[in-house]
Amino acid sequence: MELCSQASFSDAHECTSIPIIAANVQRMIKPSQSQIWAVLRAKDDVHRTYYSLISGFLGRLCISGEIFDLPEENWQIALDSIKFYDEIKHIIKNGFTSVIECNVEDYNDPEGYQIVLRQTENEAILIVHTFKNGANPPIEKHLENWKVQKE
């Protein structure tokens, strides 16, 4: 990665293991150099739209798919997510990943949760993905000493 500025993190752009792979790749490629593709489909519900976009927060958010055919609500979610990404991209670029906590055992049928904390000296972004049977992960310990700005 010293010879190029960016690389696509994986070919797994539409599977449920996107955030798991993207977090693992952070151990070898800086998130600022890792393109994470959010593939948006017109048939996706709002939960899937959020899931795909927030996965992109684990690196350089890239968007593809049927963006011109998205329902209005999903398009607004995409616009809001891009705006929020713009507010936190300096943490992705200049920060360090201090926590990758994932209790998933099967990438093809993930159950559980994943928590990723990326921080600078004064700011942090906590990215949480839940999978089947993964509701209410233990995030409180990762929020200690931080003031929550947005949820």
Q: For each of these PLM feature ranges, what is it?
A:
Residues 5-7, 67, 103-106, 117:
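Solvent-exposed, flexible loop/coil residues
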Residues 105-148:
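Carbohydrate-binding surface patches
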Residues 4-8, 75, 144-148:
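Short, low-complexity, polar/charged sequence segments that are solvent-exposed and flexible
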Residues 1-69:
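Glycan-recognition surfaces
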